[in-house]
Amino acid sequence: MKIVYQISKEFRDIEGSICISGSKSESNRLLLLRAYTSYFKILNLSDSDDTQLMISAIESDKKEINVGHAGTAMRFLTAYFSSITKKSRVLTGSDRMRQRPISILVDALKDMGCDIEYLEKNGFPPLKINGKNI
């Protein structure tokens, strides 16, 4: 049985700011939300390395992005780069990151029409992501 979810977006601008607790988890989720929408200000954004990495990766035009040890960034950016950009990107990480499975997410994204390839070991980063609007 295949379950299909349809997500649509309204084309309205968001204005204002969001004040958060400063946690890395909240910060990274809101950065991704902001990347999908019009700009809004996030107050009390975490200054963690993972959050700084998310900011630079979202804003980057580089073809290869290294997330180091940041597992949340690897997963969030896999979905983000798969779904919005019409560019090819390589998403990689540390030696340890390349030992962490990511096939459940990649399989789900492929089922939605995303174009993702494993560059080394099947089921693990690094990934080549050929982005497209889904």
Where are the regions that the model predicts?
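Structural preference for solvent-exposed beta-strand-turn elements
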Residues: M1-I134
